Amino acid sequence: MGIKNLTSLIEENAPSAIKSNDLKSYSGRIVAIDASTSMYQFLIAINTEMGAALMNANGETTSHLQGMFYRTIKLMTRGIKPIYVFDGKAPVLKSGELAKRYARRKEAEQQLEEANEVGNSEDVQKFQKRTISASRKQNEECKKLLELMGVPIVQAPCEAEAQCAELCKGGKAWATGSEDMDSLTLGTTILLRRLTFSEARKLPIMEIELEKVLDGLDLTHDQFVDLCILLGCDYCDTIKGIGPKKSFDMITKHKNIQTVIQNIDRTKNPIPESFPYEEVRELFKNPDVIKCQDLPEIVWKEPDVDGLIKYLVGEMGFNETRVQQGIEKLKKYKDTGVQTRIDTFFPMIKRPRDEDAGSAKKKQKTVAKPGAAGSKKKPAAKKAAGKK
């Protein structure tokens, strides 16, 4: 899910942090991709476009493999070097959210059954989307496919978004590819959304830069984390009556959640029973990840042609001609080679931010910068000429 209303809040208060690009703009970039959100997009897209999931002769769903194979080839032929990161065990704090999701899926399954009986195609499609989730088996199938393609994977001990952020902060990747906005809360330097969307949707990539978000909102990263908790995340409930605008205003004024709590009217804004904000804050700031220095070398290998044909065509029932065409594109990419941009290997240097970021900004606005309008000096040569 990510962070509620964070995208719209950034669009309104830090618009320069967001820009739109096409895929080719990221040629030479290494991108850590959240595999779970990608798989969900593939399952949704193919169900929507085809009206049903793709299946092999044994009745097994293959939509996730279809999407993973062809979209990864598309990324690589555009010069992007993907690293797919898979979720590990969900944190204990997320158990409440997972239980809610399970209940919503069960409810959607019942509604889907009723919509099918009535024959309402719009409702069928709507409820069908709500029942979709990637299974553990589908995760393992995608891992196998990527290994055969020669694409590196990382198994996160916990949340994939947190591991993606660690890869970015440690200089192993330039950006995170995910739909979850909490990637920014976790400290990813650049977030790319819609990276694995179907091309049929014709949506540009949305790029969000964390440092520009903090500048635009005039917050430190610690304050931003507290803002995200107030907005609503996967790990705790929200305070009733405090929406996105009020959350932003209160963090801007009070700087942290504990001071916000001290200054609200608890009759109007009751604190929920489950509001372990200190634990959630710690989870965002120090998540369970494999540190970059402890990871094995990340390498893009030659595709296993025979293995791919055996798996996709022999086991999964894919069209052999199309698979061969995909493999040829992969091989061509490997033969041509795309040079990784040099700045990919260096983590973005964060400028020191005072806890009272607002006062620093005010000072900045009142002091003229060297070379700025109103502070230009006349060239020395002209001064000398005037003395003659």
From Swiss-Prot:
It is an enzyme of class 3 (hydrolase). The keyword DNA damage applies. One of its GO terms (molecular function) is magnesium ion binding. It is found in: Nucleus, Nucleolus; Nucleus, Nucleoplasm; Mitochondrion. Residues 1-105 are annotated as: N-domain. PANTHER family: FLAP ENDONUCLEASE 1, FLAP ENDONUCLEASE FAMILY MEMBER. This is Flap endonuclease 1. It comes from Heterostelium pallidum (strain ATCC 26659 / Pp 5 / PN500) (Cellular slime mold).
